[in-house]
Amino acid sequence: MALERLKEFAQPYFALMPRVEMRQHGAHFLEGILTDLERKSVEPIAERLGESLRPLQYFLGESPWDHQPLLDKLCQRVRECLGDENGVLVVDPSAFPKKGTQSVGVARQWCGRLGKKDNCQVGIFLGYVSNKGHTLVDERLYLPAVWARSKTRREKCAVPKSVRFRTSSQLALEMVRERGRILPHRWVVADEEFGQPYRFRKGLDRMGERYLLEIPSNLLVLDLAKMPSVDGKTNGPRRALFQQVRRWKDGLRPSSWTKVHIRDGTKGPLKIMATRTRVQSYDMRRQSKKSQWLMV
C-alpha cells in the first residue's frame, strides 16, 4: 500500500526526533493528513486514529523540536539520488483553503486553487528537478503582517519570537541560499509572483544565481538595442522611455521572431516562435541598473 511505503520512507526522518513519543505522534499525524477527513486539523485526526487529543496538540503546537535536521537529511538524500550539475531549483507558492481562522497564517489572501481571494494559508515551496527526477526540498509558511503584529494570535498559536514578517520573496531567497549550497544546480526558476519584484531578482544576482523567471506582460522594460541617445549626464534612462512588455512585443517586426524546436510530442515536433533582447526593467518605482535578457 502507498501509505505503508510512505511510512517506510518517513521512518529515518522521524528517527531524528529526540523522543519516542514524538516519533509516534509524527507517524500518526502523517497518517491523519492522508485520510479522507474534510477538516484535517488535530481534533478530527486524533478522533479518527483513536489517539489522545492533548499529546498530539502539544506535539504540533508547543513541543520544542527542530524540523531543520529533517530537511537537511532530505536534502542530502535528494543530492544522492537526484543530484545533477544541470539541476534546477523551482520556487513555487501554493495556497490551502481553510474553513477556520485559528490556524497559523490564515487570512483572506490570494488563493490560486480557487482563483480568488479567500480564507487560506500560503506556503512558499522549493523544488528540485533534474533529468533523474523531481521532488520538494524545503518550505516556508507565509505569515501575513496582520499575524506578525498580533501578540494575541502569536501567543495562542505559539509562533516563535524569532519569526517576523517577511515577504514571499525574502522567504524564497532564504531557501535558495540554504538549499543551493547543497544541491547542484544551474538555474533557479519561478513564476511571475517572484519574477516581477526587483528585490527578488537582485537577491539572486547577489548570490550569483542564473535564473529564468516569468514576468507579467505589463512590466515596464527598456529595450537597450533601441535606446535613443541621451544628451548630458543623467542617472539613467528616463521613466518615459520604458514601455510594457506586451506593447514592446506588439511593435516587433516579423523578422525579429525565430522558430524554436522545444521537444518532440506525440503529434510531432513542438515548435514556438520566440525572440529575445537585452533590457532594463522598471517596477515598483525602482529602475534596475543591471541589464537582463527578456525572452518572449
Kindly give the residue locations of the regions a language model identified:
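An anionic, glycine-rich sequence signature occurring as long contiguous blocks
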Residues: K7, K132-C157, K161, F165, ...
